[in-house]
UniProtKB/Swiss-Prot annotation:
Residues 1-19 form the signal peptide. It comes from the Eukaryota. The keyword Secreted applies. Disulfide bonds join 24-86. One of its GO terms (molecular function) is serine-type endopeptidase inhibitor activity. Keywords: Disulfide bond, Protease inhibitor, Secreted, Serine protease inhibitor, Signal. This is Elastase inhibitor AFUEI. It is found in: Secreted.
């Protein structure tokens, strides 16, 4: 029983680590084509399948590690989407 639980937890972590970079690229294009100028809301976050998603606000300090499957959404001071890319 303990072994099964440990395996399930390990698989859950592995799924996040192996997220598909192609999904991120498709979603970045969708955001650029359909959501530029729209407010970033929970509904937007829930509609996107990329994992993880990082929202970048003006003046945010960010780490520079490259994660191909991570969707970065840049917003302005009014929380409106201005850009998206994978990294």
């Amino acid at each position: 029983m303990k072994f099964s639980l440990a395996c399930l937890l390990a698989l859950a972590g592995l799924q996040a680590a192996l997220a598909d970079p192609a999904t991120c690229e498709k979603e970045a294009q969708f955001v650029k084509q359909e959501l530029i100028g729209q407010p970033y809301t929970d509904a937007v976050a829930n509609a996107l399948q990329s994992n993880p998603i990082r929202v970048l606000h003006p003046g945010d300090m960010i780490t520079m590690e490259y994660i191909a499957s991570r969707l970065n959404i840049q917003v302005n001071e009014n929380n409106e989407i201005i850009s998206a890319h994978c990294a």
